């Protein structure tokens, strides 16, 4: 793992629940003792379920020794010394093929970017275009919003056809925001206090769906509202359909996908849920059947 921030630590926690992933090395400019502390305690996801300690400069988790380094340049990471197959590039800095390729130079076989690429590095989203993966050594897993939107958009487009659509994401606070008003030169609104405001913001998530689902290219765009919640975001997708369908028919199509081809990726619920009910959710997208609404058989809002 390169970058042990919010995403890096959540990747680590998720990997601990799987038998087919072994974390062998972490690179971050933090010292090992502080990394152990940040892994152990998490305000959003609670205490780490297991043992965490530091021995001889290594992180030891559940008795397993993990190499810790503090290199600024990924080219110096010597991943081959610890047998790294895949690097989770979670710094948010190295989001191009040219910069991420330094991990390959350092001995890694593959790199997964944990955010949208800044160049033409291919993006892959579960439930959308995983079948298009052709062995590329550097890929992007896009953004959290794209992972929520793409599976839903695919089901709707495959079953009813999307003429055009607008997306709004009601988005939890992220690390780039300010606790109180502060300078944010590129995005003035983004510098306003995160806990006090609903902040309109831009998002490339809807356009990114056009990259992972080319048939929707140019048909979707969207914006975001940053809201004062610590985790879990909502996608509100409003679309015009080619093929007329009642809201009940749309629900049926999504439910069928959630139990079939998209099981484990796209969830479906008819419960009276709220955002905190999805803290730690394993599906990347969960359709809230009760929250959506149709104006008519060709115009519908999905949540």
From Swiss-Prot:
PANTHER family: GLYCERALDEHYDE 3-PHOSPHATE DEHYDROGENASE (PTHR10836), GLYCERALDEHYDE-3-PHOSPHATE DEHYDROGENASE-RELATED (PTHR10836:SF76). Homotetramer. Pathway: Carbohydrate degradation; glycolysis; pyruvate from D-glyceraldehyde 3-phosphate: step 1/5. GO terms for biological process: glucose metabolic process; glycolytic process. The keyword Oxidoreductase applies. The gene is gap. Belongs to the glyceraldehyde-3-phosphate dehydrogenase family. GO terms for molecular function: glyceraldehyde-3-phosphate dehydrogenase (NAD+) (phosphorylating) activity; NAD binding; NADP binding. Catalyzes the oxidative phosphorylation of glyceraldehyde 3-phosphate (G3P) to 1,3-bisphosphoglycerate (BPG) using the cofactor NAD. The first reaction step involves the formation of a hemiacetal intermediate between G3P and a cysteine residue, and this hemiacetal intermediate is then oxidized to a thioester, with concomitant reduction of NAD to NADH. The reduced NADH is then exchanged with the second NAD, and the thioester is attacked by a nucleophilic inorganic phosphate to produce BPG. The keyword Oxidoreductase applies. Keywords: Cytoplasm, Glycolysis, NAD, Nucleotide-binding, Oxidoreductase. SMART domains: Gp_dh_N. Pfam families: Gp_dh_C, Gp_dh_N. This is Glyceraldehyde-3-phosphate dehydrogenase. D-glyceraldehyde 3-phosphate binds at residues 143-145, 174, 203-204, 226. The active site is at residue 144. It is found in: Cytoplasm.
């Amino acid at each position: 793992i390169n970058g042990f921030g919010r995403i890096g630590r959540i990747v680590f926690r998720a990997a601990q629940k799987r038998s087919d992933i072994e974390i062998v090395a972490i690179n971050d400019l933090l010292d090992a003792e502080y990394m152990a502390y940040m892994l152990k305690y998490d305000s959003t996801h609670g205490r780490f379920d297991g043992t965490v300690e530091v021995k001889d400069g290594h992180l030891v988790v559940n008795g397993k020794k993990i190499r810790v380094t503090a290199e600024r340049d990924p080219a110096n990471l010597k991943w081959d010394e610890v047998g790294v197959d895949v690097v989770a590039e979670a710094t948010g800095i190295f989001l191009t093929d040219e910069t991420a390729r330094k991990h390959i130079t350092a001995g890694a076989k593959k790199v997964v970017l944990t955010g949208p690429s800044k160049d033409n590095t291919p993006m892959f989203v579960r439930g959308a275009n995983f079948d298009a993966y052709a062995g590329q050594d550097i890929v992007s897993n896009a953004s959290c919003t794209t992972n929520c939107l793409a599976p839903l958009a695919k089901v709707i487009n495959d079953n009813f056809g999307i003429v055009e659509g607008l997306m709004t994401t009601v988005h939890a606070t992220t690390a780039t925001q300010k606790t109180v008003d502060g300078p944010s030169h590129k995005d003035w609104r983004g510098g306003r206090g995160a806990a006090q405001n609903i902040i309109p913001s831009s998002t490339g998530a809807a356009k990114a769906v056009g990259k992972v689902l080319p048939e929707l290219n140019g048909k979707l765009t969207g914006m975001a509202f940053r809201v004062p919640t610590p985790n879990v975001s909502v996608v509100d997708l409003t679309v015009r359909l080619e093929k007329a369908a009642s809201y009940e028919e749309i629900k049926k199509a999504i439910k069928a996908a959630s139990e079939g081809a998209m099981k484990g990726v796209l969830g479906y619920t008819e419960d009276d849920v709220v955002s905190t009910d999805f803290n730690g959710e394993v599906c990347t997208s969960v359709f809230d059947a009760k929250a959506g609404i149709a104006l008519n058989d060709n115009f519908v809002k999905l949540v």
